[in-house]
């Protein structure tokens, strides 16, 4: 199973970097045709990031987050994911929120987390982080993962 971090979805609506915008569109479209799931945490972060970073109107930001919610299966975090996130953050290996997302994703069988900022190639238990952005389009690793 494949999942993606908030930043991939935010780039869908960010015209300032056309290469990342196009890559995000390609990645999300491919995810829709494969066994993919999105963390409920990510859905909330999408709404917040679209409001804060891109200054989208609240109604539009909320609708974009809701669209992700309805287009993908979702997963949530439980107590064990919180414990893992606290341990990872306490050891300064990851931010609490990144660790929480990875722990929750791992618990439901996600094998690849597509993310720009969690460290390309990082292994976290049973999953691997893959940066989708290459120098001029999708990275080689995301191309292989998604069969692009």
What does each model-found stretch correspond to?
Residues 41, 45-48, 63, 84, ...:
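Amphipathic alpha-helical interaction segments
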Residues 36-43, 115:
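Substrate-recognition element of Asp-dependent hydrolases with the DxDx(T/V) motif
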Residues 8, 42, 81, 100-101, ...:
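Alpha-helix capping/helix-boundary segments
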Residues 1-38, 53-60, 136-142, 147-148:
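Short, well-structured N-terminal submotif of metal-dependent ribonuclease cores
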Residues 71-116, 146:
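Active-site neighborhoods of divalent-metal-dependent phosphate/nucleic-acid chemistry enzymes
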Residues 102, 107-148:
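Acidic, PIN/NYN-like endoribonuclease modules and their adjacent C-terminal/linker elements
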Residues 45-73:
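Active-site-proximal, substrate-binding regions of enzyme catalytic domains
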């Amino acid at each position: 199973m494949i999942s993606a971090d908030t930043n991939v979805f935010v780039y869908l609506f960010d015209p300032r970097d056309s290469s990342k915008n196009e890559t995000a569109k390609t990645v999300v479209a491919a995810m829709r045709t494969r066994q993919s799931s999105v963390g409920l945490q990510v859905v909330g972060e999408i709404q917040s990031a679209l409001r804060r970073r891109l200054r989208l109107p609240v109604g539009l930001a909320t609708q974009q987050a809701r669209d992700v919610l309805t287009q993908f299966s979702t997963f949530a975090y439980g107590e064990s994911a919180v414990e893992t996130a606290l341990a990872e953050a306490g050891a300064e290996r990851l931010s609490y929120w990144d660790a929480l997302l990875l722990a929750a994703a791992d618990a439901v069988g996600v094998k690849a987390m597509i993310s720009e900022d969690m460290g390309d190639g990082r292994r976290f238990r049973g999953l691997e982080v893959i940066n989708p952005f290459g120098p001029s389009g999708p990275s080689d690793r995301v191309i292989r993962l998604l069969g692009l």
